[in-house]
Amino acid sequence: MLYVLPSDKADFRMRIFNTDGSEAEMCGNGIRCFARYLHDFGLTEKEEFTVETGAGILVPRLQIEAGKVTGVRVDMGEPVLEGEKIPVTGFGMNRVIEEDIEVKGKTYKMTCVSMGNPHCVIFVEDAEAFPIYELGASFESHPAFPRKTNTEFVEVRDRQHVRMRVWERGAAVTLACGTGSCATGVAGVLTGRTDRKVEVELDGGKLTVEWDEATNHVFMTGPAELVFTGEIAD
């Protein structure tokens, strides 16, 4: 659930709550939906504006054709790569790239990134076949992650295309994760698997992620579609 709130630091403030009631710092898919909501319901006439989140101030830009929002490009800011800032236990200020993590008796290679929230990226041979339902919770609550973690299981198709499935902290398996897609794009570059611009295929659709070398900012572009409207009773 997303809340639209006033901000003294940005044009708007966004708060996010997971299905288990916990509050998240950021949601990449959420901020695209948030941006479209502001436009469609007349809360802003701007095509680009600032949003205060738990991960800092982010800048969505609406892509509009014939008066309709066709997509949203979001400047997601700089990725955080230092272990203790993500946080991941035992790495201090070092980066966590292709480091061992043992889950249920098997060792995997993890690359960890924060996009305002923690992510553990695991590259796998076959994303469809990976037992995400059996192992996802064990990654999320692993002792290496003091604030738990989101975990992305990623199959590299080529240097511009990856297939990603995600176990989200506080929400389990979801159809897509915007910050997870950004973390995946960064991890692909850090491990030499992908280019700086990559298409991420998720269960719920596709996102384009670009880690800009000049600014060190990550840009995410994707759709935001109206599914339904409703009212919550008092």
Regions of interest found by a model, annotated:
Residues 49-51, 96-103, 113, 198-200:
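Short acidic-hydrophobic surface loop/beta-edge motif
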Residues 60-61, 107-112:
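Short, surface-exposed loop motifs enriched in S/T, G, D/E and P with embedded aromatic residues
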Residues 79-80, 226:
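Active-site/binding-pocket entry motifs
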Residues 80-109:
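Active-site glycine-rich loop that binds ribose-phosphate moieties when present
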Residues 1-68, 120-234:
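A glycine-rich beta-to-alpha transition motif near the start of alpha/beta enzyme domains, typified by
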Residues 71-73, 77-79:
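Membrane helix-loop-helix hairpins that form the core translocation module of multi-pass transporters
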